[in-house]
Amino acid sequence: MQDVKTYLSTAPVLATLWFGFLAGLLIEINRFFPDALVLPFF
């Protein structure tokens, strides 16, 4: 039962950090490459 409580308290925290990082990354990409339909990295 302790493992379930640990999972329920950890997964939302990790998801929040991951989605926050992903949102920040997308915002920065759109800042340097505005209105890009295809990322011009290659």
From Swiss-Prot:
Topology term for the membrane: Single-pass membrane protein
Domain of life: Eukaryota
A GO cellular component annotation in the UniProt record: photosystem I
Example GO BP: photosynthesis
Transmembrane segments: 7-27
Places the protein is found: Plastid, Chloroplast thylakoid membrane
Major subcellular location class: plastid
UniProtKB keywords: Chloroplast, Membrane, Photosynthesis, Photosystem I, Plastid, Thylakoid, Transmembrane, Transmembrane helix
Pfam families, A to Z: PSI_PsaJ
HAMAP family in alphabetical order: PSI_PsaJ (MF_00522)
UniProt record similarity statement: Belongs to the PsaJ family.
Function description: May help in the organization of the PsaE and PsaF subunits.
Protein name as annotated: Photosystem I reaction center subunit IX
Organism: Marchantia polymorpha
Taxonomic lineage: Eukaryota, Viridiplantae, Streptophyta, Embryophyta, Marchantiophyta
